[in-house]
UniProtKB/Swiss-Prot annotation:
UniProt cross-references to Pfam families, sorted A to Z: FliW
Protein name: Flagellar assembly factor FliW
Gene3D superfamilies associated with the record: BH3618-like (2.30.290.10)
Keyword Cytoplasm: yes
Cellular compartments annotated: Cytoplasm
UniProt family annotation: Belongs to the FliW family.
A cellular component term, taken from the record's GO annotations: cytoplasm
Quaternary structure, from the entry: Interacts with translational regulator CsrA and flagellin(s).
GO biological process: bacterial-type flagellum assembly; regulation of translation
The protein's role, per its UniProt record: Acts as an anti-CsrA protein, binds CsrA and prevents it from repressing translation of its target genes, one of which is flagellin. Binds to flagellin and participates in the assembly of the flagellum.
Underlying gene: fliW
Keywords linked to the UniProt accession: Bacterial flagellum biogenesis, Chaperone, Cytoplasm, Translation regulation
Annotated source species: Borrelia duttonii (strain Ly)
Length: 130
């Protein structure tokens, strides 16, 4: 099955823990609403999704400097994704990193991992509530 959606995004600063990787491809996954964020060399893969898929009222406090770093000048250019942590034995244990979202300029295809200063956001937010 061929992926329907695929974009190449530049991360001038890399992402936390992978600062040397500057380009990723974000593409559809067979498991909606998740996407795959894969390094250009194919060695590193992250599962990502919009935090709004499971937390409608997600309001990250992202500094204006972070948006300027990716040249996002208006709301129509801004996209927020979060990295998903999978737990193979129990899907109910899937967590999302709300503390360090991936922010994208969808027009210029530039990204950055930002830090939300909202104290209610956790590194491991449980996606599926009981």
């Amino acid at each position: 099955m061929k992926n329907k959606f695929s974009i190449k995004v530049k991360f001038p600063e890399g992402i936390l823990g992978f600062e040397d990787i500057k380009e990723f491809i974000i593409k559809d996954s067979a498991h909606k609403p998740f996407s795959i964020m894969q390094s250009i060399n194919g060695e590193i893969n992250f599962l990502v999704t919009s935090p709004f898929n499971f937390l409608e009222k997600y309001l990250p406090n992202i500094e204006n400097k972070d948006w300027l770093d990716i040249q996002a000048e208006n709301e129509n250019e801004k996209v927020i994704l979060c990295i998903i942590n999978m737990h193979v034995k129990n899907y109910k244990e899937i967590t999302a990193n709300l503390k360090a979202p991936i922010i994208l300029n969808k027009k210029k295809l530039i990204g950055k991992q930002a830090i939300s200063t909202n104290e209610e956001h956790y590194l491991r937010y449980r996606v599926f509530k009981e």
